[in-house]
């Protein structure tokens, strides 16, 4: 007797069931779904956010605009849409580190960060990072924040999304915006890591 093993999580199983039903009723096609996924992974994706961060590192006027009105500043670079109708940028520095969560569901600035990672949507992350952000960053991401640095948690919602602007790594003086984007990861813009160092990438 063989035993059936469900390889999907609860949310994945629900999504698959809905997707199958829509296919059967002819409301969508697999090709259409593939195009949407490819668009968010390749055309939008976290590279948009990386360009915003890199520009803020080299352009003081843009950085100031980003601080005052991130939604408009990002829209000026072409990053706007339903999931970016109101975005606030929070800036890491030597005294403060920011981390983003959505405690109610998985609100996320898709136009600049692409598809949210599975862990961001998980109940475990959403509940634990609010109560113990420093512990979650260390245990789940191997990211140890020094005791003297304050950790602030920002709760995204349907009204407002957040993007973390990580500190510019040392040793990048003279780098172009294009080179700097390679240092900016999706995780650093959620706040579960720092930007990469020059030693961690090949420019």
Swiss-Prot record:
Q: What is this protein called?
A: High-molecular weight cobalt-containing nitrile hydratase subunit alpha
For this protein, the record's NCBIfam families field holds: nitrile_alph (TIGR01323)
SUPFAM superfamilies listed in its UniProt record: Nitrile hydratase alpha chain (SSF56209)
What the record says about family reads: Belongs to the nitrile hydratase subunit alpha family.
| Essential cofactor(s) | Co(3+)
> Source taxonomy lineage?
Bacteria, Bacillati, Actinomycetota, Actinomycetes, Mycobacteriales
Q: Which regions form coiled coils?
A: none
EC nos? 4.2.1.84
Induction is noted as:
By cobalt and urea or cyclohexanecarboxamide.
Q: What does this protein do?
A: NHase catalyzes the hydration of various nitrile compounds to the corresponding amides.
Query: What's the superkingdom here?
Result: Bacteria
Use in biotechnology or industry: Industrial production of acrylamide is now being developed using some of these enzymes.
Q: Reaction catalysed by this chain?
A: an aliphatic primary amide = an aliphatic nitrile + H2O
Q: What class of enzyme is it?
A: lyase
Q: How is the cofactor bound?
A: Binds 1 Co(3+) ion per subunit.
Q: How does it assemble?
A: Heterodimer of an alpha and a beta chain.
Which of UniProt's keywords are assigned here? Answer: Cobalt, Lyase, Metal-binding
Gene name, Swiss-Prot/TrEMBL: nhhA
Instruction: Tell me the Pfam families matching this sequence.
Output: NHase_alpha
Q: Which residues bind Co(3+)?
A: 102, 105-107
Q: Which organism is it from?
A: Rhodococcus rhodochrous
């Amino acid at each position: 007797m063989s035993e059936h093993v469900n390889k999907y999580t609860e949310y994945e199983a629900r999504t698959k069931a809905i997707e199958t039903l829509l296919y059967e009723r002819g409301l969508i096609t697999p090709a259409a779904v593939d195009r949407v996924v490819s668009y968010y992974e390749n055309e939008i994706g976290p590279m948009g956010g990386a360009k915003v961060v890199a520009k803020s590192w080299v352009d003081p006027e843009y950085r100031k605009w980003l601080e005052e009105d991130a939604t408009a500043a990002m829209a000026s670079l072409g990053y706007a849409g339903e999931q970016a109708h109101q975005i606030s940028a929070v800036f890491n520095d030597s005294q403060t580190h920011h981390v983003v969560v959505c405690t109610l569901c998985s609100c996320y600035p898709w136009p600049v960060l692409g598809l949210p990672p599975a862990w961001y949507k998980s109940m475990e992350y959403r509940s634990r990072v609010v109560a113990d952000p420093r512990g979650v960053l260390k245990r789940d991401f191997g990211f140890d924040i020094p005791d003297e640095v304050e950790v602030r948690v920002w709760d995204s919602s349907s009204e407002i999304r957040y993007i973390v602007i990580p500190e510019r790594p040392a040793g990048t003086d003279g780098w172009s915006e294009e080179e700097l984007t390679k240092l900016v990861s999706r995780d650093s813009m959620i706040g579960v890591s720092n930007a990469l160092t020059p030693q961690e990438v090949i420019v």
